[in-house]
Amino acid sequence: MKRRRVIFILPIISLIVLSLNICSFAMNTGFSTSEPDEKKQQYFLSGNAISLTYEEPKKYIISCFDVSESGLVAVGSATYGNQYIYVYDATGKFQYGYAFNNPGSYGLQWDGSDLIIYFVRSDIAALVDSAGNIKELKVIDDTEANNSYWNKYVFAKERTQNGNTYTMKSN
């Protein structure tokens, strides 16, 4: 009888232990990703400090954007290696922004109230909260499906959210 109880309880305990190891952030991205090794993670973090601002910076040409389910609009722009992300509410009022220095292209995607910044040159996805903290990093795998996702979603000029269509246009 004791042996049966152990055989029954052991799988349950194993499931509980495994479920506790699941990352609490678990970035939701359309890419297939992997964990960065310690060296790549430290290298990326040392060269890509993200600063938060509550003052609306000067506007530059829009390079990317995304719209959250709650109606927040994140707009990315760049000038001479300096990148900026501006976050606006559904009425167009500036909420906060990020500034960082990265010598390559990037894309944006909302993940709940957090923002995923996709760094093209380094193949890194960084999950950033509204306070400018990097919560999680992932390496974007080099696959055909990921190449398609870059073009069809991340760099798309149009987004539809909650029945509204948002389009990025150059004048």
Tell where the protein language model's regions lie, with residue ranges:
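Eukaryotic scaffold repeat domains enriched in small/polar residues
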Residues: R5-N171
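N-terminal secretory signal peptides that target proteins for export/translocation
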Residues: M1-R3
